[in-house]
Amino acid sequence: MPPPLLPKRSKLETEKAQSNKITPREEQQSEKIGKSNHAASSSSSSTQGAVKRRSVFEDVTNASHSQCVQSKEDNIELKSHVSKRTKKGVGEVTQKKIKSSKMGHVTSLSNMEKEFILDIPNKPKTLTTEEPSVFQKTLVLNEEPATKETCLMRKTLKSCAFHQETLLMEKPLTLLVETEDYNEFDTELMTSKKKDKPEDPTIIEEMTDLKKSVIRKVTLTSSPLWLKNKHVVQEEKPVIQEKSSFKRISLVSNVVTTKEKPPVKKPHFRKKKPTTEMKSLLQEPSLEEKYNTQEDASILKKPQVLQENTNNKDATLTEPVTFKGKHSANEATHTKKPSSSKNNPDPQGKGTNLRPLRVHPVTYENEPMSSKKSTTKKKDSHFHGPSVLPDKHSPQMEVSTVKKSLALPNPTTEEKMLHFPVATVLEKQHNMGEAPCLKKPSPLRKQQQLPKRRRFFSNSAVQETVIRKPLFFKMSTTEKDPPSQWPSALPKKHISPGELSKQKKQHVSPKHNMEEDSQCWLDSAFKKQLSREEPASTHTPLKLEMQQAITKETGFHLRNPLVLPTVTSEAKSLTKEPPSFREQNTSLLKRKSTTHTITLQQAQSEWQEMTDEDRNLFSIKPGSHRKEPIPEFLQNPLPPNENCLISQKLSHSMPFASQKTTSQERAHRKESVASNDDKNFFSQDLFSPFSSADEDTLKFHKSLDFQEQVDRKNDSHKKMFDSQDSVSEEESFLRKLFCKDRCSSTEELSQERTVALEQEFLLIKILNENTSSDVDEPLSHQSPHIQNHSDTTKEALEASEALEAPEALETLEALVASEDLEEPLNILEELSTENMVALMKMLVTEDESTKDSFSGNYTAAREAHAEKSLSLEETSINEAATLKESLSSQEKHRAELVTVLKELLVLMKNPSLKRVALAFQENPSNNVETLLREVLALVENSTADESTLQEKPSTKTDVTPKELLALEENSSNKKANPMDSLSFDHKPDTEMGEIARMVLTDEEYNIDTLYERVLALSQGLIAADQLSFTDLQNFEETKIVDEEEFFKSFLVFENKNSPNMSSNAFESRTDNSSAIMPSSKAFNPVENSNPYVSSSKSFKSTLGAKETEITIQDDSDSLERIEKEGQDPLLNTIYAKDVFNYLKEREEKFLVQKYMDGQMELTSDMRAILVDWLVEIQGSFQMTHETLYLAVKIMDLYLMKAQCKKNHLQLLGSTTYMIAAKFEESYPPSLSEFLFICEDMYEKSDMVSLESSILQTLNFDINIPTAYNFLRRYASCIHASMKTLTLSRFICEMTLQEYEYIEERPSKLAAASFILALYMRNLSNCVPTLEYFTGYKMAELHILVRKLNHLLNFRSHSILKNVFEKYSEETYFEVAKIPPLSKQDLENLLNCALFH
């Protein structure tokens, strides 16, 4: 069917005639006008036609209902115009007809298809009147209309405004599918515009399809044939994508689009004036970003094609020249700068721009800046011209410009000079535009890791880096160092994988390119490290790019970009960059700075704040990267330990694990020492591309194993420092090993070359010897251990004197027997851990009977181990075997120690009162105070780090807190060990004073090892993961403190409550075996006293709470807060009974009767919905439960006495909540907030008047007892755990929504809820106590208990889920997920309670 005509057909036809009459002079004039002014791009007749076309397009885009059917004659006329143009030739005739074709902006589906075909071939051929011939010939026309296209772009964009663009966008979607030339697209649009009048309706249909086809663009762009034109296609894509956005911003974009018309051909000229438009565009980054991301998707689909286009730089450059026709020469010059000046943050454009390393770094955002600076320049004007669609045109232009810029690096340097001053202007805009782009591209990167993805990823990365770049440029502008910052700009630009590919193609010193790329990736990745999406994506593109244009060696080198803090020769220039980065992002940028020298120093200074200098020795370079990775390696420390061999290559997926990267860096450095062939070029970075892949990889794995373990085993180094008797050799060795990181690259090479083999040999020895030092320290330098082996016997004797537990002896003997079967590497480890266990048990049991026997066994074991370790030292087993054996032994002895620690926990959880009393007596308060002071001195510097350690326990984290303890001094562990020994020695009675002194002198290393081992093992336990390094040092110390507090509180409680012991909770405290009390509550007094007795000490938060978690059992995790706050005189249990007796009397006054029958418009379901909403409000405002219960009670009391309309029910709920909040809350929400939660449906006067009415109805007596008050009372009486209390609250709160429970007394409802909670928690033995304190017998409660259990069983059928969801959260112990009792089980329990 012939498509309907657009409205005002006659006008359109006249416009066609007028446009056909246009002369070449007019075209030239219009072009000139377009250059100078986008407002007037054609003659008066053309402007009129443009206006008419705009109206037509508006009608079309808006899907105006007035659409006429166009006759076939119109189609014939259009075809004739096309044929005439083709016959006249590619020159003036085509241009004239194209101008005349302004009239027909809308193309039919067939026309669009033909246009697509036209776009494909760029050969100049004549079009036939027939559509098929047009289809073929139009393909030929693409090259012909070079100048035509410019005019077309001008006129079409101007005339079409964004409406035509919408149409064009619709068309371009298909065009994009078949052709990817913006120029072709424009020419076809011109021709199709003539033809399209009859086919407008179909075009409208295609618009919808085209919108859909935005997705198609990706598939369409996949065709590599149009790579050269691809940039045009990309521009078209943005046009399509921006259609929706343009509809919104059609007015502004229309102004610019008129100037956009020639952006491909004459964009350079027309952008002079639209600088303001550029600003507007930049201010409209959402448009750019939207279609950018879409284009990126398409680009990802067609990534190879895009890369090929970039490869065909010359062809693309020539094509833009041909397409642009007259302006081709100008563009050549312009594109040189435009490549840099591509402000358009199109990810693709950026990718292309990024690829020219030298041109792109500054040019990308700098030229936009320069363009803004000097809009007079064509280049600037061009960018301003496309700025309307900066993303549309920029990618294409950028491709060509980048290519040209590659060919013309000199102007890029000039551009750089321009960029620095201008950078400040555009940086903000680009940052704004790019930020969203970054958000979108990151997921795209994840989704697509194709080689094109590099481009896209690099674009996204570049966008991120570009965001930083403008900052850098700002810095540079302020610093006025543009010339010196050019290389720095390159690293800051972080030449994306796209640049990498270009560099590869350019073959410009591929090593430098790789290094630069890796640095760029490093910087970008580091900057992106905050967003964890990018690390993986960055690594993958690096791998892809490296595979393409780089050897596997270099590829691997890039795989460890994080390890590469520096880039060979460019590291110096990079060193210049980091200052700017630091100024921009301070510590983060410092960490991210890729410079080797600066990062070493700065990273050390920063990392010293977080770790030991020993650790700095290992991670000097990665130190810069480590600050960021710290949280992540804490999170994922275990995998590195286990996968030290494998993950190191793969660690790039987790580049932020600083220790991994550091170990890898060290390994690379060591490899560089071993393999000197490839290191010459990477000497500064100490990164070898691994010339001998096999040998180097083996060495690399070994070194990685060593050094990762060393990272995790800083304790060995610490021990080395601790045992200063033998440290001299170890220090020299370690410094030789790790001073390389601090030394300059050249010095490092020389030193490493000389020492490489020796270091590897020493590392092997150290690995074999020192696996015993710590569970996580196979690499611990064993020279101190070996030298101290002679002293180990003495240390064993001293330790045996200190260890007085018979359990310790038994366990030690058993462990030693098992250890004899294992290799000597495991013996010292297990012995050390056993010694710690023995110390802990001795401290708990305090039994001195087995001192001699234990000492003998311990000494023998230590001697045997010393001999075996010496023999090991001579034999020096292979590193891999040693590591495997050490791992297996660690696992075995870890499992054994787990059982031992569990036994200790059991002992500590259930100490007899006598033993506690003895411990308290043996440990005078003076010793405790001294210990606490020492502990505080140790803990003050590591509290935050320990908290993170506890949250994320792992083998690495075990080492980390230790190192964190030694922030200020390298030998902090050495000092900590004496303090630890003091704490252990003070804990036993005075008899241990001498032993303590001996331990200070000789046993420092031994205790250190024990502590470290127990620390490593303790975190494998669920309950014991609270045993941090300091906790282990002060384990018994905390125990004693708790015991001391226990006795104080116990005596106080007993004195205060002796007269009322039967009526308060402390009756159970006097008798640990009381039947009233749960069996697990025996140690509750410590829990009760601990929170507030030690609250004045900072020791509480770090150690006291941990001790509580260890000693308290399942049902006594913590008590009710009110009971913990027993010091409050208002909550004193002496008055508790009288207070609640008063409340029980008072509740009689506020009993609610069923009132729903008296309500005209309300139902029980409405009430349930309202209460459910109130529960949600309580959680949103974080108000107390008392407020919620009181609000519901006030509402029921009011509705019992007054009528309420349906439309005022929400107002009633909000008002009652406000009244309750004023009564219960310390800081109640304001009236406006309560109106806001009602969505401002009511006026302030309405709520005030209703509040007055409610208070008057209740006689202003709102101190109403609620079930929640009684629940708290009952929980305090029976010492229920918070979990049990929370479960009872959940049961009781479920009744708030149920209308049938409003008649129940609050005290009775609370009692039934609590009894059901006890049954559900298997605490039926507490029911008699509850009956006593509540005053209700089971005979009175069993019916209500059954109803409540039925309610819980059928809660899943309820539509109202707020209560259930609330108590399903972890903050409420997920009590809602506890399965309710079956009917039969409940009956059995109730029968037992009733008849026994």
Swiss-Prot record:
<feature type="modified residue" description="Phosphoserine">
    <location>
        <position position="703"/>
    </location>
</feature>
<feature type="region of interest" description="Disordered">
    <location>
        <begin position="477"/>
        <end position="500"/>
    </location>
</feature>
<feature type="region of interest" description="Disordered">
    <location>
        <begin position="259"/>
        <end position="398"/>
    </location>
</feature>
<dbReference type="InterPro" id="IPR006671">
    <property type="entry name" value="Cyclin_N"/>
</dbReference>
<comment type="subunit">
    <text>Interacts with CDK2 kinase.</text>
</comment>
<protein>
    <recommendedName>
        <fullName>G2/mitotic-specific cyclin-B3</fullName>
    </recommendedName>
</protein>
<keyword id="KW-0597">Phosphoprotein</keyword>
<feature type="compositionally biased region" description="Polar residues">
    <location>
        <begin position="780"/>
        <end position="790"/>
    </location>
</feature>
<feature type="compositionally biased region" description="Polar residues">
    <location>
        <begin position="306"/>
        <end position="315"/>
    </location>
</feature>
<dbReference type="GO" id="GO:0051301">
    <property type="term" value="P:cell division"/>
</dbReference>
<keyword id="KW-0131">Cell cycle</keyword>
<dbReference type="InterPro" id="IPR004367">
    <property type="entry name" value="Cyclin_C-dom"/>
</dbReference>
<dbReference type="InterPro" id="IPR036915">
    <property type="entry name" value="Cyclin-like_sf"/>
</dbReference>
<feature type="compositionally biased region" description="Basic residues">
    <location>
        <begin position="264"/>
        <end position="273"/>
    </location>
</feature>
<dbReference type="InterPro" id="IPR013763">
    <property type="entry name" value="Cyclin-like_dom"/>
</dbReference>
<feature type="region of interest" description="Disordered">
    <location>
        <begin position="1"/>
        <end position="64"/>
    </location>
</feature>
<dbReference type="Pfam" id="PF00134">
    <property type="entry name" value="Cyclin_N"/>
</dbReference>
<dbReference type="InterPro" id="IPR039361">
    <property type="entry name" value="Cyclin"/>
</dbReference>
<dbReference type="GO" id="GO:0005634">
    <property type="term" value="C:nucleus"/>
</dbReference>
<feature type="region of interest" description="Disordered">
    <location>
        <begin position="775"/>
        <end position="796"/>
    </location>
</feature>
<keyword id="KW-0832">Ubl conjugation</keyword>
<feature type="short sequence motif" description="D-box">
    <location>
        <begin position="54"/>
        <end position="62"/>
    </location>
</feature>
<keyword id="KW-0539">Nucleus</keyword>
<keyword id="KW-0469">Meiosis</keyword>
<keyword id="KW-0132">Cell division</keyword>
<dbReference type="GO" id="GO:0051321">
    <property type="term" value="P:meiotic cell cycle"/>
</dbReference>
<feature type="compositionally biased region" description="Basic and acidic residues">
    <location>
        <begin position="10"/>
        <end position="34"/>
    </location>
</feature>
<comment type="similarity">
    <text>Belongs to the cyclin family. Cyclin AB subfamily.</text>
</comment>
<dbReference type="Pfam" id="PF02984">
    <property type="entry name" value="Cyclin_C"/>
</dbReference>
<keyword id="KW-0195">Cyclin</keyword>
<comment type="function">
    <text>Cyclins are positive regulatory subunits of the cyclin-dependent kinases (CDKs), and thereby play an essential role in the control of the cell cycle, notably via their destruction during cell division. Its tissue specificity suggest that it may be required during early meiotic prophase I.</text>
</comment>
